[in-house]
């Protein structure tokens, strides 16, 4: 990982060498690095997925938590421009990071066969997500509260990031190097 996120040239070689079944990534404000995959690298990642027929699992819990400028489009959004790439992409999202950690509501957009298996696994693990939590989230979203909530949480996380970076500089100085996050937790 460098300043533009996952190094796709190196990934290409690793895929050839190891032939993975899937590649898991947090391309936007990745944890713990804070790196965001550039637009060019996102496109190349989708192209690699098609070339090697390997599933990309895009975990996108932080995509809406940018501090200033929005990040590049998600792999899911880009897949509309790269025919065939959706067949090799699973996109995971969550309300937990933006609304409430206890809410535990997320989603998966994936190829139909994978989605069917994921639904079965979910049912085996806990039967279903809390109906109350789902209804609460649906009501909140339908009422149009999300933009204000996002603005508030973005401001809080940006302030926390500034405090953390200042503390790292003051306490550790040149002994530590880090990427100044542009979003996320």
List each model region and its residues.
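Short, conserved active-site loop motifs that form the nucleotide-linked donor/cofactor pocket
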Residues: 54, 89, 176
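Short, solvent-exposed loop/turn segments at secondary-structure junctions
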Residues: 28-31, 62-63, 96-98, 112-115, ...
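Residue-level signal for well-ordered alpha-helical positions
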Residues: 35-36, 68, 78, 120-121
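Conserved glycine-rich beta-strand-loop-beta hairpin in the small C-terminal domain of fold type I
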Residues: 138, 155-165, 175-185
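Active-site phosphate-binding strand-loop segment of PLP-dependent enzymes
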Residues: 4-67
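Conserved core segment of the aminotransferase class I/II
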Residues: 80-155, 162
């Amino acid at each position: 990982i460098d300043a533009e996120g996952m190094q796709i040239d190196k990934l290409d070689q690793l895929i050839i060498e190891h032939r993975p079944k899937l590649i898991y990534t947090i391309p936007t404000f990745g944890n713990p690095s804070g790196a965001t995959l550039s637009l060019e690298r996102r496109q190349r990642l989708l192209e690699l997925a098609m070339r090697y027929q390997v599933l990309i699992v895009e975990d996108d819990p932080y995509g809406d938590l940018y501090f200033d400028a929005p990040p590049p489009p998600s792999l899911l959004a880009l897949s509309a421009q790269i025919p065939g790439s959706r067949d090799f992409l699973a996109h995971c999202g969550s309300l937990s990071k933006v609304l409430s950690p206890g809410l535990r509501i997320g989603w998966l957009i994936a190829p139909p066969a994978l989605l069917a298996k994921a639904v079965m696994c979910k049912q085996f693990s806990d039967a279903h997500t809390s109906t109350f939590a789902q209804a609460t989230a649906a009501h909140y979203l339908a009422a149009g509260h999300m933009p204000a909530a996002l603005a508030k949480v973005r401001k809080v996380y940006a302030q926390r990031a500034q405090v953390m970076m200042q503390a790292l500089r003051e306490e550790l100085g040149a002994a530590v190097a880090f990427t100044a996050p542009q979003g996320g937790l």
